[in-house]
UniProtKB/Swiss-Prot annotation:
Its main location: nucleus. One of its GO terms (molecular function) is DNA-directed DNA polymerase activity. It comes from Schizosaccharomyces pombe (strain 972 / ATCC 24843) (Fission yeast). This is DNA polymerase delta subunit 4. Appears to have a role in the stabilization of the DNA polymerase delta complex. Coiled coil: none annotated. The gene is cdm1. Keywords: DNA replication, DNA-directed DNA polymerase, Nucleotidyltransferase, Nucleus, Transferase. Belongs to the DNA polymerase delta subunit 4 family.
Length: 160
């Protein structure tokens, strides 16, 4: 592998990924991942359409969790002095999760995900909201949707 790269540098040729990894499947290739020829009529995997639900859709389907979210929302709003500013585009679920992120009574929040923070607070008997735990344990609240990451998870310094 290294020998091929040094030879390409000596000869003045540019090395690309296809030279380094010749057996890797490419989308425009007619080879499967095990190196066997596949005709254009055959498909190595069946075409499957996967419908993904958003977190809000999933919560609306679950009546019990929907009621808990509504109760948590009402409880948070009762504690507040005024209406939240700049929350027109935030759903109730996102607002509850943001409230959990910014509430100091559940321990430190920098450098950990919401799930890690919730579990830590549970282990230290800080009584984190069960509603937040149920929301975070839903499949739709995975890392890809960034719901498990806290508000401050990828906090970066401001340049300048």
């Amino acid at each position: 592998m290294k020998k091929r790269t040094t030879q390409a540098k000596k000869s003045g040729q540019n090395t690309n990924i296809r030279d380094v990894f010749p057996h890797v499947v490419r989308s425009n290739s007619s080879q499967s991942h095990i190196g066997k020829k596949v005709s254009s009529e055959q498909s190595p995997t069946p075409d499957v359409t996967i419908t993904t639900k958003t977190l809000d859709e999933r919560i609306k389907e679950d009546d019990e969790l929907s009621k808990e979210v509504e109760e948590a929302w009402n409880q948070i709003m009762a504690e507040r002095i005024s209406e939240p500013i700049h929350c027109e585009n935030i759903t109730k679920v996102e607002f509850i999760l943001h409230h959990f992120d910014t509430t100091a009574r559940y321990g430190p929040y920098l450098g950990m995900t919401r799930m890690q923070r919730w579990k830590r607070a549970k282990n230290f008997n800080l009584n984190p909201p069960e509603t937040v735990g149920k929301i975070l344990m839903l499949e739709e609240a995975d890392e890809e949707n960034r719901k498990r990451e806290s508000l401050f998870y990828d906090l970066q310094t401001i340049p300048g």
